[in-house]
Regions:
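Compositionally biased, low-complexity repeat tracts
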Residues: 6, 20-23, 58, 202
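Glycan-processing catalytic domains of CAZymes
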Residues: 28-339
């Protein structure tokens, strides 16, 4: 069995660029008219960012999320890989350490021509989840989105509206009530929730897929990497929810054995194929001219669940495989240029 290693940032950037040059070349997509489309010819690539390293509740990864130099280096590397924004997991005042990390990321993003967004971790409590969410969103707006907030100009927007992602936990929040509150902001945010519409479809402006093995469930060898899950997500969004903002999903692998909450879940990197195929899956469902606005990499640095891309795109150790991949990218780029 081949071990996983990582390509250099240069190869990563080349591959990422190539992947987004070939839109329209990967099969016939059904006709669809999107309300929210990419502002350019390709989706903007963003990445989920964990800001909890340095606390005793999480494993040591050799750095703390409170080190400005670490964050500057991460931003520089992400930009070199074609990533334009970090989507930071955020828990409101439930996790002060993470809140402080977020402030650092936003400030440094503003100074380094990078973007940042918040992914709200819903409180998993039966009573008070709605009030908690409203209080957290209000806090976030006042501290990070107001005109005098440090680094507010770095916040990720679409057509001038800030994007806020929601990661559901327990589904106890009345999002219609939260929506009514945030609609009073100027500008009102675009709320993006995981998976397809649930009990409050009108409360959300868009949806994103999350790492999932698909209907066959988790395989011991990691061979169920999520192709059917992603296909179902994109098919449903194209056919039923083309009026919503669609954020695509991509993941390199998953192995959560290091996490204290481990469920022994595993998705094989397949020598980098899992990443490249998830990154491109959306193309099969959306034709040229109907490009989705964002693709979100899951994740930049979740080392506990083993979905990190910070070290680079997973590949295989054999030298010939790297040479073959480089040749494949160069050949495909030449073909694309001639089209």
């Amino acid at each position: 069995m081949l071990d996983n290693t990582y390509m250099s940032a240069g190869v990563s950037a080349t591959l990422l660029s190539f992947l987004f040059l070939i839109h329209g070349c990967l099969g016939q997509a059904p006709p669809v008219q999107l309300t929210y489309r990419a502002t350019g010819s390709s989706p903007e690539v963003i990445a989920v960012y964990e800001a909890w390293f340095g606390t005793p509740k999480h494993i040591s990864v050799g750095y703390t999320s409170h080190d400005p130099e670490v964050i500057r280096n991460q931003i520089r590397k992400a930009k070199g890989m074609g990533i334009s924004a970090f989507v930071v997991d955020w828990y409101g005042d439930r996790e002060p350490f993470i809140d402080q990390s977020y402030a650092l990321v936003q400030n440094l993003a503003a100074k380094n021509e990078f973007k940042v967004a918040m992914m709200y971790e819903e409180a998993n409590v039966e009573e008070g989840a709605t009030d908690e969410a409203i209080a957290d969103f209000t806090m976030f707006h006042d501290i990070y989105l107001s005109p005098d907030a440090p680094g507010h100009q770095a916040y990720l927007t679409y057509q001038g509206r800030p994007l806020i992602f929601v990661f559901p936990n327990g589904n106890h929040t009345d999002w219609a009530k939260v929506r009514a509150v945030v609609n009073k902001w100027n500008p009102a945010p675009l709320l993006i929730q995981e998976n397809l519409p649930g009990p409050h479809p009108d409360a959300f402006d868009g949806f994103y897929p999350w790492i999932n093995p698909g209907p066959l469930g988790w395989a011991a060898d990691g061979s169920n990497w999520g192709d059917r899950y992603l296909a179902d997500f994109y098919k449903n969004m194209a056919e039923k929810y083309s009026d919503k903002l669609i954020v695509g999903g991509a993941w390199p692998k998953l192995d959560d054995h290091k996490a204290s909450w481990s469920l022994n879940r595993h998705i094989s990197a397949r020598c980098g194929q899992t990443y490249t195929e998830t990154l491109n899956m959306w193309r099969k469902f959306f034709p040229a001219g109907q490009t989705i606005p964002f693709v979100m990499i899951e994740t930049w640095n979740d080392y506990e669940e083993g979905s990190e891309i910070e070290p680079g795109i997973p590949t295989c150790t054999e030298p010939s495989s790297k040479t073959a991949l480089n040749n494949q990218v160069k050949s495909s780029l030449a073909t694309t240029t001639q089209r």
